[in-house]
């Protein structure tokens, strides 16, 4: 069978949830008083939206093949990403065989090197790459995980990220990751409140349930060290993304400082094999958390995972729903997955990209069999208003 070529590439934007999961209405736990790099300024401390965390919005990339098959994916990128796709990246895709994903990734990355490398450009490349994998799998009438070598386990097991680990335990998750609420600018009183919250949750969940703290790039080495050492009393399993992503030296120091048995994790805001090579070779962490929608897509995550495996470091992708599920189920060094609790009070399981995607699977009792529908197995919700700002 002759493989089809790529006929059209289209980029859309949408507001209100979706891949930009911070784009939520008021009262959501994800926009509460959470420690951030901007929390050093009191006026930006109470809400993450106050400093613009949700300004980008969701980017939807749609790729149509010459046989009419359509692949798509969503990521964070919004109108900036749509511009990059339509004005720059589309030229490297249209007319190419749907199988030539490695070549297309290479051309997208190196053509944007002078203004890209990380951030919104890599988010955009990631979205295109995921759409290419969705397209190829649909052409072959297979789930993406079969293109990646097939599953190595029957089902995924999950920990939950959200404000209520105690409720996550009742729902069957293996652990709960809390957002850290107070950073260095709030002093010893804030540190005490962080520890009190951890102690409260430990008393609720017992000793056999993982508890972790997500620090979202907001700490420095001295504060993170104090937090880790004091939190050890409450059995903190790992401390996540304490420092700015580029502070590899700080991460290496922190990993030496934390109590024995506690893990340091990071990588949510890192990109490409070269960024993760720094983390791995400098022994910055015990597990890495690439986001497949930001780090370079499936094509790059394959390389990142192989690097980590050679360093005996686990790969636990950040969020990203079906895009990470199809990868995690195929890799031994990804023994569990993250589920982001998108219910406003973190009190029920709802799809991560709701309301944008239809057929998006969710864990039941903390477990999931990855669906075997072609591609990533999801559809765009026709009730979500997509806008194509740079139609060609």
Curated annotation (Swiss-Prot):
Cofactor note: Binds 1 Mg(2+) ion per subunit.
Chain ranges passing through the membrane: none
Binding site for substrate: 22, 48, 338
Keyword Metal-binding assigned: yes
Record site feature (Transition state stabilizer), residues: 338
Superkingdom of origin organism: Bacteria
Catalysed reactions listed for this entry: L-rhamnonate = 2-dehydro-3-deoxy-L-rhamnonate + H2O
Cofactor(s) this protein requires: Mg(2+)
An MF annotation (GO) of this entry: magnesium ion binding
Gene3D superfamilies, alphabetized: Enolase-like C-terminal domain, Enolase-like, N-terminal domain
Site keyed Increases basicity of active site His: positions: 291
InterPro entries (alphabetical): Enolase-like_C_sf (IPR036849), Enolase-like_N (IPR029017), Enolase_C-like (IPR029065), L-Rhamnon_dehydrat (IPR023444), Mandel_Rmase/mucon_lact_enz_CS (IPR018110), Mandelate_racemase_C (IPR013342), Mandelate_racemase_N_dom (IPR013341), RHMD-like (IPR046945)
Protein EC: 4.2.1.90
Catalytic residues of the enzyme: 318 (proton acceptor)
Any single biological process term in GO: amino acid catabolic process
Keywords linked to the UniProt accession: Lyase, Magnesium, Metal-binding
Residues holding Mg(2+): 214, 240, 268
Enzyme class per UniProt: lyase
Note in the entry: Reaction proceeds via a syn dehydration.
Subunit details: Homooctamer; tetramer of dimers.
The family this protein is said to belong to: Belongs to the mandelate racemase/muconate lactonizing enzyme family. RhamD subfamily.
Function: Catalyzes the dehydration of L-rhamnonate to 2-keto-3-deoxy-L-rhamnonate (KDR).
NCBIfam families, sorted: PRK15440.1
The protein's name: L-rhamnonate dehydratase
UniProt source species: Paraburkholderia xenovorans (strain LB400)
Gene: rhmD
